[in-house]
A protein has these predicted regions:
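A structural signal for multi-pass alpha-helical bundles of membrane permease subunits
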Residues: 2-291
Length: 291
């Protein structure tokens, strides 16, 4: 129970925060949804066109390609990041010397901005590929795996911290009991360690998946969506362009009338990411109930 004298001051302290939330999030969000049903060059001349923007979004070959490219990227990066992060975390919780230093080194890339990382790795990749007469911007396979390497290098340290917390929460008595029962290290890992860090695995899985779909600045700096490919109808698409970058390029493209389509794409993108987030919350609640 909140005392009445304290309750009186609630509007004074909560008011500015609520106003800032409405101005900074609620109004722009609602305005964005409305504009996704409009055709406009500037928001002041928007006129309602119904579901036309959504129809054009689904018929846009570049948007469809960027969705499948992003989905493939998110799945591959999810597997690699979590396997490597868990392996590093497991190794660093085995009492090796200098483990704190190694944790710091692995975590440091996560503190560097995505744009900076993109340009750094662009120079690294081009320096290597130039010896073979090619560039990361000339081959979509190089671009894809370049983005994977960059994402893994940046995210492994962050996921490692979560896995270390999960590993350190396992009771020592449980590990000692497994050892007394004659379980090998491999059996202990699969039968004891991994089941007990499932909450950490769930969190890292959904974080990796969400980060993979939301990736923007690294994509912009490393490949910019290039190279181009020509479709059968004569149009061209960027082969390494991900969803967020596709939305930006659609909004600020040469055709100003496509801004409504870009807004519709942004709403679809929000629904996708929000769905992943809700699935994570649901999975975490189920784990809490089971425990």
């Amino acid at each position: 129970m909140i005392r009445r004298p304290i309750r009186r001051w609630f509007p004074l302290f909560m008011g500015p925060m609520v106003c800032a939330f409405i101005i900074g999030f609620v109004y722009p969000f609602c305005k964005g949804i409305y504009l996704s049903f409009c055709k406009f060059k500037v928001t002041s001349d928007a006129h309602f066109v119904g579901l036309e923007n959504y129809r054009r979004a689904f018929q846009d070959a570049s948007f469809v390609h960027s969705f499948w490219f992003t989905a493939l990227f998110a799945i591959v990066s999810l597997v690699l990041i979590n396997v490597l992060a868990f392996a590093v975390a497991y190794a660093l919780t085995q009492g090796i010397k200098g483990s704190n230093l190694y944790r710091t080194v692995f975590f440091m890339p996560n503190l560097i901005g995505g744009i900076v990382l993109g340009y750094i790795w662009s120079m690294i990749f081009d320096g290597i590929l130039s010896r073979y007469g090619t560039s990361i911007l000339l081959n979509s396979k190089y671009g894809f795996w370049g983005l994977i390497i960059l994402m893994c290098w940046q995210q492994i340290g962050y996921m490692m911290i979560i896995y270390i917390a999960g590993l350190q929460a396992i009771p020592d008595d449980m590990l000692e009991a497994a050892k007394i029962d004659g379980a090998s290290r491999w059996q202990t890992l699969w039968k004891v360690t991994i089941p007990n860090v499932m909450p950490s695995i769930t969190i890292c899985t959904f974080l990796s998946l969400t980060n993979g779909f939301k990736l923007f600045d690294q994509n912009l700096a490393l490949t910019g969506g290039q190279p181009y490919t020509i479709l059968s109808d004569g149009s061209s698409i960027k082969t390494t362009e991900m969803l967020a970058l596709n939305i930006l390029n659609t909004f600020y493209g040469q055709n100003a009338n496509s801004r409504g389509t870009a807004q519709a794409k942004a709403v679809l993108f929000f629904i996708l990411v929000a769905t992943i987030g809700l699935l994570q919350l649901s999975a975490n609640r189920k784990k809490e109930v089971q425990q």
